[in-house]
Amino acid sequence: MGKYFGTDGVRGVAGADLTCEMAMLIGRGAAAVLTSSTGHKPRILIGKDTRQSGDMLEAALTAGLCSVGADVESLGVVPTPAVAYLVRKYNADAGVVISASHNPMEFNGIKIFAGTGYKLPDEVENEIEAYIDNQCAGLKLATGDDVGRVTCRTDGIKDYTDHLYESIDGDLSGLNICIDCANGASAAAARQLFPRLGAKCTFIGVEPDGKNINAGVGSTHLDNLEKAVVEGGFDCGIAFDGDADRCLACDEKGQEIDGDKVIALLAMNMKEKGCLDGNTAVVTVMSNLGFIKFMESQGIRTEKTAVGDRYVLENMRENGYAIGGEQSGHVILLHHTTTGDGELTAGKLLKLLAKSGRKMSELNGIYAQYPQVLVNVAANAAQKAAYKEDKVLADFIENEEQKLMDMGRVLVRVSGTEPKIRVMVEGQDLEAIDLCAKRIVDKINERIIKG
């Protein structure tokens, strides 16, 4: 991670951490780097989610880009994976997403895709950070006809939906599904896509007001969807997050289907069809032990990376694997896209369900998960840095994991996107792992937060 760019772009509270001044500097730095690397006036797409601060940050970012000579094409509210796809379809030099994904509305972020549809390499982000650090001092600003122009595109959602329809290539006739769009960026595409595939659809979380993105809805708040599915007699439920780069689901009984389960189901299907490249699925250290053991039983290899879809993607690209993702619902299908895509993932899962002739609860029951306790400890940047340097705390955590022996594991890490230290304890004995997590959290509070 760089000074400003975390695992998923620049993130923070809009107007406080991520200011208009910062957005303009990012725009100027990005335009300068792209002009230098391409040798021409760059074309840059901008998409955003439904946060109230999105318009403000887009205006500042656009001003920065145009002031150094880049042309901007505004896509409006679109999913993050739509930008990753459209930057390639429209032969743009880069695509920018203004979103904080699953985070509350007061947060926002700026993430940049290269013209290839992949996130910018670290070295390019470092070049942009250098411009930010020196306030773009000495950077020649455009004048006259060299100033960038701004146009608005209205064809993005249709082109993206056409791409999804062709990639899913399925018939969902006979399925009755409830879809939660998190009051975010997925609604327009989802309302076109899933009925077009033949499903009977009921949509919730489709009334964004700038403030209610991810608020009690979407993939981080499945309760409402699970209740709606059971009460409405739906075959299953699908939930996206605010920018639709992740997807979780629930079966007809209201039981959650997490990213691990989705990856397992899709990977098994790909293996049957002979398209599971390398016979491997790439996951992160957060994946459940029950998932890992099940995949072994199916003869499918798993490779683990650090938490973050960018690390999953790096491994997939380096080794030629076709599927990877995270327990949180990021699933990357490299045969079709360059990033996590919630709507593509949902379509593939629903296609599998429709062809199986089985209930979603039967698919959901392919393996039993080990109990898992997750606790987030609020921590600022200084506290996160102190945690990384605390040898006494590291020894304490290692000792706690040893107490679980082969029946569980402990993972403590600092979040790359939020002001938190995340504590995860997993094992067969729920009471034991709950106590273990409590002891670790208490020790973190004692040494780092309150100390």
Which functions belong to the PLM regions below?
Residues G47-D49, I179-C181, D251, H335, ...:
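Short glycine-centered, acidic/aromatic-flanked micro-motifs in structured strand/loop junctions
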Residues V13, N108-G232:
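Gly/Ser/Thr-enriched, mixed-charge loops and adjacent short helices
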Residues M1-A63, S67-V68, V150-L175, K384-A385, ...:
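An N-terminal, well-structured beta->alpha segment
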Residues G39-D49, E73, N176-C178, N279-V285, ...:
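Short glycine-rich phosphate-binding loop at a beta-alpha junction
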Residues A32, S36, H40-F107, Q192-C250:
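N-terminal small/polar loop signature for handling phosphorylated ligands or for N-terminal nucleophile
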Residues C236, K273-G451:
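Phosphate-binding and adjacent anionic-ligand microenvironments
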Residues L75, N126-T161, E166, E252-G325, ...:
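Proline/glycine-rich low-complexity loops and linkers
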